Amino acid sequence: HRFESFEEAGFTICSPKKKEWEEASLQVFELLNRLYQNFPIYRSISSQQFSRIFQKYQHILDFSMVKLAYKEGKLAGFLIAMPDYGSLVYQKLTPLNLAKLFWTKRFPKRYMIMYLGVDEEFLGLGSALAYPIFKEAQKRQASAIGALIHQKTVTRHYAAELQGDKHEYGLFELDL
Protein backbone atom coordinates (compact mmCIF):
# COMPACT_ATOMS: atom_id res chain seq x y z
CA HIS A 1 0.00 0.00 0.00
CA ARG A 2 0.94 3.63 -0.49
CA PHE A 3 1.48 4.14 3.27
CA GLU A 4 4.37 1.67 3.29
CA SER A 5 5.80 3.01 0.03
CA PHE A 6 6.04 6.51 1.49
CA GLU A 7 7.69 5.19 4.65
CA GLU A 8 10.15 3.26 2.48
CA ALA A 9 10.84 6.50 0.57
CA GLY A 10 12.06 8.16 3.77
CA PHE A 11 8.88 9.79 5.04
CA THR A 12 8.07 9.72 8.73
CA ILE A 13 4.33 9.49 9.30
CA CYS A 14 3.36 10.03 12.91
CA SER A 15 0.78 11.38 15.32
CA PRO A 16 1.84 14.32 17.49
CA LYS A 17 1.60 14.15 21.25
CA LYS A 18 -0.66 16.65 23.01
CA LYS A 19 2.37 18.53 24.37
CA GLU A 20 3.73 18.89 20.79
CA TRP A 21 0.46 20.29 19.41
CA GLU A 22 1.37 23.99 19.62
CA GLU A 23 4.54 23.51 17.54
CA ALA A 24 2.91 21.00 15.18
CA SER A 25 -0.08 23.27 14.56
CA LEU A 26 2.24 26.11 13.52
CA GLN A 27 3.89 23.78 10.99
CA VAL A 28 0.40 22.89 9.74
CA PHE A 29 -0.37 26.64 9.53
CA GLU A 30 2.63 27.30 7.28
CA LEU A 31 1.78 24.46 4.90
CA LEU A 32 -1.96 25.21 4.99
CA ASN A 33 -1.30 28.87 4.19
CA ARG A 34 0.78 27.94 1.17
CA LEU A 35 -1.60 25.28 -0.14
CA TYR A 36 -4.91 27.09 0.34
CA GLN A 37 -3.90 30.63 -0.68
CA ASN A 38 -5.35 30.23 -4.19
CA PHE A 39 -8.76 29.02 -2.96
CA PRO A 40 -11.54 31.45 -3.97
CA ILE A 41 -12.66 32.31 -0.42
CA TYR A 42 -9.24 32.12 1.23
CA ARG A 43 -8.46 34.86 3.74
CA SER A 44 -5.03 35.13 5.27
CA ILE A 45 -4.74 35.16 9.06
CA SER A 46 -1.70 35.57 11.27
CA SER A 47 0.03 32.65 12.96
CA GLN A 48 -1.14 34.09 16.29
CA GLN A 49 -4.78 34.03 15.17
CA PHE A 50 -4.33 30.49 13.87
CA SER A 51 -2.74 29.41 17.16
CA ARG A 52 -5.64 30.84 19.16
CA ILE A 53 -8.10 28.84 17.04
CA PHE A 54 -6.14 25.57 16.92
CA GLN A 55 -5.00 25.71 20.54
CA LYS A 56 -8.59 24.96 21.54
CA TYR A 57 -8.58 21.82 19.40
CA GLN A 58 -6.12 20.11 21.73
CA HIS A 59 -8.93 19.49 24.21
CA ILE A 60 -11.18 17.65 21.75
CA LEU A 61 -8.69 16.01 19.39
CA ASP A 62 -7.85 12.35 19.54
CA PHE A 63 -4.20 12.79 18.58
CA SER A 64 -3.95 9.22 17.29
CA MET A 65 -6.25 10.42 14.49
CA VAL A 66 -3.96 13.29 13.51
CA LYS A 67 -1.27 12.31 11.02
CA LEU A 68 1.76 14.38 10.10
CA ALA A 69 4.18 13.38 7.35
CA TYR A 70 7.75 14.64 7.42
CA LYS A 71 10.40 14.38 4.74
CA GLU A 72 13.91 15.31 5.86
CA GLY A 73 12.53 17.04 8.96
CA LYS A 74 10.10 19.26 7.02
CA LEU A 75 6.31 18.88 7.16
CA ALA A 76 5.18 17.49 3.81
CA GLY A 77 1.55 16.74 4.63
CA PHE A 78 -1.06 16.47 7.35
CA LEU A 79 -4.45 14.98 8.00
CA ILE A 80 -6.57 16.03 10.97
CA ALA A 81 -9.58 13.89 11.87
CA MET A 82 -11.63 14.29 15.00
CA PRO A 83 -14.56 12.56 16.61
CA ASP A 84 -17.91 13.77 15.32
CA TYR A 85 -19.21 15.76 18.28
CA GLY A 86 -22.18 17.11 16.34
CA SER A 87 -23.38 20.31 17.99
CA LEU A 88 -22.04 19.26 21.41
CA VAL A 89 -18.99 21.55 21.18
CA TYR A 90 -21.29 24.58 20.78
CA GLN A 91 -23.45 23.82 23.81
CA LYS A 92 -23.03 25.15 27.33
CA LEU A 93 -20.40 23.14 29.24
CA THR A 94 -22.58 21.59 31.90
CA PRO A 95 -21.28 18.54 33.79
CA LEU A 96 -23.54 16.33 31.64
CA ASN A 97 -22.30 17.86 28.37
CA LEU A 98 -18.70 17.59 29.55
CA ALA A 99 -19.26 13.89 30.26
CA LYS A 100 -20.80 13.49 26.78
CA LEU A 101 -17.75 15.21 25.24
CA PHE A 102 -15.34 12.88 27.02
CA TRP A 103 -17.45 9.84 26.11
CA THR A 104 -17.58 10.85 22.44
CA LYS A 105 -13.84 11.51 22.40
CA ARG A 106 -13.15 8.08 23.89
CA PHE A 107 -15.82 6.07 22.02
CA PRO A 108 -16.77 7.91 18.83
CA LYS A 109 -19.19 6.43 16.35
CA ARG A 110 -17.77 8.59 13.58
CA TYR A 111 -14.63 10.55 12.76
CA MET A 112 -14.69 13.64 10.58
CA ILE A 113 -11.70 14.26 8.34
CA MET A 114 -11.45 17.98 8.92
CA TYR A 115 -8.22 19.08 7.25
CA LEU A 116 -5.97 17.49 4.68
CA GLY A 117 -3.01 19.16 3.06
CA VAL A 118 -0.09 17.80 1.07
CA ASP A 119 2.84 19.63 -0.49
CA GLU A 120 2.39 19.58 -4.29
CA GLU A 121 5.77 17.91 -4.56
CA PHE A 122 4.46 14.73 -2.92
CA LEU A 123 1.33 13.69 -4.79
CA GLY A 124 -0.17 10.51 -3.38
CA LEU A 125 0.83 11.33 0.17
CA GLY A 126 -2.77 12.23 1.04
CA SER A 127 -3.82 8.65 0.41
CA ALA A 128 -0.96 7.41 2.59
CA LEU A 129 -2.15 9.71 5.39
CA ALA A 130 -5.81 8.68 5.02
CA TYR A 131 -5.11 4.94 5.10
CA PRO A 132 -4.17 4.62 8.82
CA ILE A 133 -7.11 6.87 9.76
CA PHE A 134 -9.61 4.65 7.94
CA LYS A 135 -7.96 1.50 9.33
CA GLU A 136 -8.03 2.82 12.90
CA ALA A 137 -11.66 3.92 12.58
CA GLN A 138 -12.52 0.47 11.25
CA LYS A 139 -10.69 -1.17 14.18
CA ARG A 140 -12.70 0.99 16.60
CA GLN A 141 -15.93 0.05 14.80
CA ALA A 142 -16.43 3.66 13.81
CA SER A 143 -16.78 5.27 10.42
CA ALA A 144 -14.65 8.04 8.97
CA ILE A 145 -16.24 10.76 6.91
CA GLY A 146 -14.32 12.80 4.38
CA ALA A 147 -16.62 15.78 4.08
CA LEU A 148 -17.20 17.70 0.88
CA ILE A 149 -14.73 15.97 -1.41
CA HIS A 150 -15.18 17.18 -4.95
CA GLN A 151 -15.96 14.33 -7.37
CA LYS A 152 -13.29 15.40 -9.86
CA THR A 153 -10.39 15.38 -7.38
CA VAL A 154 -7.97 12.58 -6.60
CA THR A 155 -9.08 12.59 -2.96
CA ARG A 156 -12.26 10.72 -3.87
CA HIS A 157 -10.10 7.58 -4.26
CA TYR A 158 -8.37 7.77 -0.85
CA ALA A 159 -8.62 4.45 0.98
CA ALA A 160 -11.20 3.37 -1.61
CA GLU A 161 -11.22 -0.23 -0.39
CA LEU A 162 -12.22 0.99 3.08
CA GLN A 163 -14.95 3.35 1.94
CA GLY A 164 -18.56 2.45 2.52
CA ASP A 165 -21.40 4.74 1.57
CA LYS A 166 -21.11 7.72 -0.71
CA HIS A 167 -23.54 10.62 -0.73
CA GLU A 168 -23.77 13.40 -3.26
CA TYR A 169 -24.48 16.99 -2.31
CA GLY A 170 -25.16 20.10 -4.30
CA LEU A 171 -23.84 23.52 -3.44
CA PHE A 172 -25.98 26.30 -4.81
CA GLU A 173 -25.92 30.07 -4.68
CA LEU A 174 -28.86 32.40 -5.13
CA ASP A 175 -28.15 36.06 -5.72
CA LEU A 176 -30.86 38.18 -4.11
Where do the model's predicted regions map?
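Short, flexible helix-coil linker/hinge segments at the edges of structured domains or between repeats
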Residues: 1-12
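Active-site/acyl-donor-binding loops of N-acyltransferases
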Residues: 1, 64-67, 71, 77-102, ...
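A generic structural signal for short coil/turn motifs at secondary-structure boundaries
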Residues: 40, 121-123
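A short, polar/charged loop/turn motif at coil->beta-strand junctions and beta-hairpin connectors
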Residues: 7-8, 107, 166
